[in-house]
Amino acid sequence: MFVVLASLFMACGTPKDGYVVKGSLKNAGDGYAVISVADHTGASVIADTAEMSGGKFRFEGKTPFVAACSLRVVPEGKEVLDMLIVLENSPIKLQGDWANLERNTGGSFFIRDMKVTGGKNTEVCNLLDEVYFSTRRLPEFKDYERLEKWFASLDENAELTDEVMRKADTLQEIEDRFRELVFGKQLEIMAAHPSSEAAALYLTPMIDGMKLDEFERVFGLFDEAVRNSEMLTDIREELETRQRLAPGRIAPVFSLAQRDGQMLSLA
């Protein structure tokens, strides 16, 4: 996957049916931007680099399939911004103001009110992301961010007092309710976009909490081409592993060569 993507990222010229990624980040200044992809080991490898001048940068090329990529923006003398983009053969525009750079509770930076527009998969990502942000704004989650910051500030050796345990339990209850609402609404959007690889990728944080039959049902909502796409390899392999290990399922046949050359089959 990486070799194919990297060779196409680095291709000269602008393919008529390829992608153009344009960034316009006010107040970012000069620097550079980097697109990285994961190799077969999961390690992040740089695929292309672009100079940034006055907050503007540009990538162009062609990808043989939709791919989840890491975009890193590195302004001179400023904080570094890392974000995920779904690369597809269409124009993609990123617009924002570096003055709105903020840090989330996990320590990563993001640009508040950043706008990303593009092809089908980018627009589906926007729909799914808006579910997250709109749910966070609901009155019932007004204490969510405060408790997240409190939890992140705790020392690993902090004393587990009754107050600490009470707040931790409250945070867990809020998180469980938040995930329930967000995942439910996102699943509705996924069902409405069966041809979107990006929609299926958003299953990633959900599958740990899914039983096998639900996992099979939800993944089966997507078109066959989507289910077999490169970007969903990890999800597909997780499903196949669960299916093999599920009680009552027919086990795969394994063949083992014996010393006399005969094959021993185990099922």
Segments the model singles out, each with a brief description of its role:
Residues V80, K93-Q95, L101-N104, R179-A246:
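N-terminal targeting signals for export/organelle localization
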Residues F2, S36-H40, A152-D155, K167-D169, ...:
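Short, functional N-terminal and low-complexity linear motifs
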Residues C12-I174:
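A non-transmembrane, solvent-exposed segment enriched in polar/low-complexity residues
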Residues M10-A11, S255:
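Short intrinsically disordered, low-complexity segments
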Residues M1-M10:
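Sec-dependent bacterial lipoprotein signal peptides
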